[in-house]
Structure formats: structure tokens, C-alpha cells
Design a protein with these regions (language model features):
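Gram-negative (and chloroplast) outer-membrane scaffold detector with strong preference
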Residues: 48-118, 126-130, 134-136, 155-163
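Subset of outer-membrane beta-barrel
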Residues: 34-38, 125-133, 139-152, 162
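Active-site helix-to-loop segments that bind/position phosphate- or nucleotide-bearing substrates
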Residues: 29
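Positively charged n-region of N-terminal signal peptides that target proteins for export
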Residues: 1-6
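Sec/Tat signal peptide C-region and signal peptidase I cleavage site
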Residues: 19-25
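Solvent-exposed loop/turn segments connecting transmembrane beta-strands
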Residues: 33-42, 66-73, 108-113, 144-152
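Bacterial N-terminal signal peptides
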Residues: 7-18
Length: 163
């Protein structure tokens, strides 16, 4: 009888892993800083869907140009994949992300570059109340073509609504 219960355990565990998990979606509105080459405000929105550990997100962000510092304006349109903790740990859900998309960079109505780019980063989502969360995110971009700054970085804080 004992051998039978041990042989049923792997089968039952496999069924648990193969059972469908509910998908979740979320939207994040954020403000942050792009310090490359000088600190400027970045604002944007991300919309995502998650399946327990894996998620996908489309994100739009805009950084204003600073003509006095010769810091270009930057628009990014990125599609990202996320790997995240399946459940919050002490009210926090950690994630890593990587993605690709299109960017547009301008400065002083003289310089303009549109091309593709990639990004990697990570962050944390903190549970507040119900579906409302705070999100903190850090990204490093690699911009192709001839941008003025090919490796901009970004840190943001945002309000995230899970539905």
C-alpha cells in the first residue's frame, strides 16, 4: 500500500502543475527619472497580462528633452516579457524583464533618430489594498542606429491596477 501512495504522488503533482491557471491583467501609470545624460522626467503607461510566472507587457514612455543640457527627448514603445514570482512574498512580487521595440530621439528640432532598441531590467510590485499596487522599476536600454546616447537608463515609480 505504501508503494502505491508513493507512485500516486508524482502523478498527482503532475496534474497540479498542468492544471490551467487564471490569467491576470494590469495597467501601470508611472513617473520617473531618466538620468542619461542629465536627470529628466519620464512618464508613461504599461499594459500587461500574466500567467502565474510568465507575463507580457506593452509599454509607452516619454522623456522630455533638456535643451540647456543638450539632453534629447526620448519616446519608447516596447514589448516586454516578464518572469515573476508566482505569488507575492510578504506583499511583494519581484520580476525581471527583457524586451524590444521602437524608439524616437530628438534634440533642438535639428537632430532626430528613429530605430529599434532592446531593454533589460527588473522591479517590484507592492500590494497596497485590493487590486491596487505600487510598482518600482529599473531599466537599461540599448538603442540601435545613431542615437546621441545609446545606453539610457530609467527608474520609475507607478500606480498599478490589477484586474
Amino acid at each position: 500500500m505504501r508503494a502505491l501512495s508513493f507512485s500516486l504522488f508524482p502523478f498527482a503533482f503532475s496534474l497540479l502543475l498542468l492544471s490551467p491557471a487564471p490569467a491576470t491583467a494590469d495597467i501601470t501609470a508611472f513617473l520617473g527619472s531618466n538620468p542619461t545624460p542629465s536627470a529628466r522626467l519620464v512618464k508613461g503607461v504599461g499594459v500587461g497580462v500574466g500567467l502565474v510566472i510568465v507575463g507580457f507587457e506593452f509599454e509607452y514612455a516619454h522623456t522630455n528633452e533638456d535643451r540647456e543640457e543638450s539632453a534629447p527627448g526620448l519616446w519608447t514603445y516596447m514589448f516586454n516579457g516578464l518572469v515573476q514570482t508566482p505569488v507575492p512574498i510578504a506583499g511583494m512580487q519581484f520580476y525581471g524583464t527583457a524586451g524590444a521595440g521602437v524608439f524616437h530621439e530628438t534634440l533642438n528640432d535639428v537632430f532626430s533618430e528613429t530605430n529599434v532598441g532592446i531593454n533589460v531590467g527588473g522591479g517590484i510590485k507592492l500590494n497596497l489594498a485590493g487590486p491596487l499596487r505600487l510598482r518600482f522599476d529599473y531599466r537599461v536600454f540599448t538603442l540601435q542606429g545613431s542615437p546621441l546616447y545609446s545606453k539610457p537608463q530609467r527608474f520609475y515609480a507607478g500606480v498599478n491596477l490589477r484586474f
